[in-house]
Design a protein with these regions (language model features):
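A composition/biophysics-driven feature that prefers long, compositionally simple stretches
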Residues: 1-212
Length: 212
């Protein structure tokens, strides 16, 4: 994960002239990109998870999480230092990242970074680039305020980030390939197929049951 974010994302954001990329989603309504930007032990967004990627002048990318955790230190957890009442916060005077407080903090971040372009995952053609749900988009655009005029659609950013692999991933892919070949070999062997009796549907169901 860290290798992809370190080596793949900066080049893509530069190529597509994206100064900021925002991924915002709610629990069990994740963006398709979600599983490519979080640790493998993270199975769902946390209430609302907002990940913000900002391109720095030197070409590197700042990675901030506004809810959703740091994913083992891959992200910096962006927190507000503004005092809030115990009722609104976590009991210790710190703002809890949920609801309006989360959006206010997001607005602070955008104002501070002042990006010329903000990429959101909205696209009518590419499913992998259309992960911003309708209600989430409305809330996000309200939070952006005047910065909504800087929103751009760049579907290639999400698609290419999901698609590009780094060398460290290849050994695992070879293991997956070996597993697939082993399953297919058994599916079409006499261990599963009885000539004259076994149907193609039988084989399909065997495969479904085997991989679940």
């Amino acid at each position: 994960l860290e290798a992809r974010l370190d080596r793949v994302l900066p080049g893509l954001m530069a190529e597509y002239d994206a100064e900021m990329w925002v991924l915002s989603m709610r629990e069990y309504a994740e963006d398709p990109v979600f599983w490519s930007v979080v640790a493998p032990t993270t199975f769902a967004a946390r209430r609302r998870s907002i990940y913000v990627f900002t391109r720095r002048p030197d070409g590197s990318v700042e990675r901030l999480a506004l809810g959703g955790g740091t994913q083992g230190g891959v992200y910096e957890a962006f927190r507000s230092s503004r005092p809030v009442s115990e009722r609104e916060g976590d009991g210790e005077g710190n703002a809890e990242l949920w609801g309006n407080e989360q959006w206010w903090l997001f607005r602070e971040l955008v104002e501070d970074r002042d990006p010329a372009s903000i990429v959101l995952n909205i696209d009518e053609h590419q499913a992998f680039s259309d992960g911003l749900h309708a209600g989430e988009r409305e809330a996000l655009e309200r939070a952006l305020g005047p910065y909504v005029d800087r929103v751009v659609r760049e579907p290639r950013l999400a698609v290419d980030y999901i698609a590009v692999r780094v060398p460290e991933m290849m050994p695992r892919y070879r293991e997956v390939e070996e597993t697939v070949h082993a399953i297919l070999s058994r599916a079409f062997s006499n261990a599963v197929v009885t000539p004259g009796e076994t149907t193609t549907d039988d084989v399909r169901w065997w495969l479904r049951e085997r991989i679940r």
